[in-house]
Curated annotation (Swiss-Prot):
S-S bridge residues: none
Alphabetically ordered keywords of this record: Ribonucleoprotein, Ribosomal protein, RNA-binding, rRNA-binding
GO molecular function: small ribosomal subunit rRNA binding; structural constituent of ribosome
Protein name per Swiss-Prot or TrEMBL: Small ribosomal subunit protein bS6
Keyword Ribonucleoprotein: yes
Keyword rRNA-binding belongs to the record: yes
Biased composition (Basic and acidic residues): 105-115
Function: Binds together with bS18 to 16S ribosomal RNA.
Region (Disordered): 94-125
PROSITE patterns on file: RIBOSOMAL_S6
Amino acid sequence: MRHYEIILLIHPDQSEQVPAMLERYKGMIVAGGGQVHRVEDWGRRQLAYLINKLAKAHYLCLNIEADQAVMAELEHAFKFNDAVLRHLTVQKKKAETGASSMMKTVEREEARKASQAEFAASNER
């Protein structure tokens, strides 16, 4: 089996359906004998250019180990799901389980927003 990294751009109006989509895709991988090594929800982010007249999308990153039959099934599911705006699958040499640089950026942004909110709350007193 080979290792893959999959990036999904989901329609921003479908953000509530993301957990159900993830479970469905993870179920397809496990049912095919594969493994899910890492799942990251990067949240709603600005796009570099408009896709279907949308300026934002919900980003997901999956690191998996699967065979070609499972990958073909996943690619087919991505193509025929209207909520998936774009998908990118990259073959990797080994499984990556640590936090990606994008996830570290997301965590830094969340920490910065929390500290700003805390600072604003302390100044109101």
